[in-house]
């Protein structure tokens, strides 16, 4: 049994420290330490990360680093990068970082040259997408492919669609992408609307191909294709990531169009693997290489930087500080870039599937809360939806603001004298400032506000935020942002002592759904279910589908 982190002197020291400073206001913290606005910040690659507006002092950061060391964060980090089997429940290495190693790097895991394998797949992906983008690869009728449709779910969908949206400005070969994930037929029908089968290529993306949603959607897509072009067309209009040769051959996929990845890559960590084929098809292999290089910048920073200057480690520790000592349950992710509109949804899977665990890696129950609930929307949309709760609600919600100095698009403001991007970013800076420092009753009253209205306008402040600022949203920056959060997840998981790389919690629901499907569709009235609620729901559903209840 591993040591319980909450029983360590480092945890107790943080608990005592929280009792001392937990109620201190950010206004006071800045007054006591005016330099914190510039000194509690780090530059990592293209990311400027300001963590000064957090309810921490320099002493807090020292104690959090002590906690990380007590939990063995540095040793666990080194074990991950070395390819040790730190996913203990599945006895697997955890090597998503190997997907972005440069070609001349060396890493042998379980007797296999991992880097050579990774670049072999990348080279094959590059050759395939070059042919698509140049028009050398054509469909069954000889026409160019103009749309790739990615069929996947979870990590095989959330990553590719997020990155595609973020990098849409780098589409330069007349190829667009659509993404199908939900087994609700409305999703596939909507995504196929307006497409021409002769100009469409399907990418079936699934790590294990045991996922019912992906199998069902792929089969329906094949039928749409063959109804128009015949069975022989499938080989010219489909690809598979990773290969499952028996199924793929039956489906009709050409084995040259299958691209593998490995069991040491978790689905939610796989957008930089063959699962990103749809992204590469749209932006090209050179831009995809820049995307991978961005990941590697942050990987190397996390691997080598001292903990006091290690951005992912510090941000993960600060997240844990709020979760376990302030009782915060969620973190808002607020990108001031519409191109990152799917980033919060992507992070939901990355963080919540990784750290939503109630037992530690050794199988014993955890003794503290684990897993932050991630959510968010792009600014300024969120300002007119849920920022009211952030500013004046009773719940503490730390927030990450992400913004860019140079826009991907810009237009003049309504009066023609300014930039809409400047207007957007003025809101970014204003929101972090008001969340931190608020506005007092005295200041509001001094403006002539009626006394009975003053309490309603008080902005308490002391709401913590991280500000992440980059010059522009590029392929490299997207990779850097993803890796920044990947390693925060790892940091928190190590402190909590959990396995951040399995996801057993999703399996039972899949099994039960398979068992219930024939109950829903059978010709005869089904046997009673094990609970009266499900039994009543099933019978009502059957009745409304015209089947005997």
UniProtKB/Swiss-Prot annotation:
The active site is at 353 (proton donor), 384, 510. GO terms for molecular function: carbohydrate derivative binding; glucose-6-phosphate isomerase activity; monosaccharide binding. InterPro entries: G6P_Isomerase (IPR001672), G6P_Isomerase_C (IPR023096), Phosphoglucose_isomerase_CS (IPR018189), SIS_dom_sf (IPR046348), SIS_PGI_1 (IPR035476), SIS_PGI_2 (IPR035482). Pathway: Carbohydrate biosynthesis; gluconeogenesis; Carbohydrate degradation; glycolysis; D-glyceraldehyde 3-phosphate and glycerone phosphate from D-glucose: step 2/4. PROSITE patterns: P_GLUCOSE_ISOMERASE_1, P_GLUCOSE_ISOMERASE_2, P_GLUCOSE_ISOMERASE_3. The keyword Cytoplasm applies. Its main location: cytoplasm. One of its GO terms (cellular component) is cytosol. Its EC number is 5.3.1.9. Keywords: Cytoplasm, Gluconeogenesis, Glycolysis, Isomerase. It is found in: Cytoplasm. It catalyses: alpha-D-glucose 6-phosphate = beta-D-fructose 6-phosphate. Gene3D superfamilies: 1.10.1390.10, Glucose-6-phosphate isomerase like protein, domain 1. One of its GO terms (biological process) is glucose 6-phosphate metabolic process. It comes from the Bacteria. CDD domains: SIS_PGI_1, SIS_PGI_2. Pfam families: PGI. Signal peptide: none annotated. HAMAP family: G6P_isomerase (MF_00473). PANTHER family: GLUCOSE-6-PHOSPHATE ISOMERASE. Catalyzes the reversible isomerization of glucose-6-phosphate to fructose-6-phosphate. NCBIfam families: PRK00179.1. Belongs to the GPI family. This is Glucose-6-phosphate isomerase.
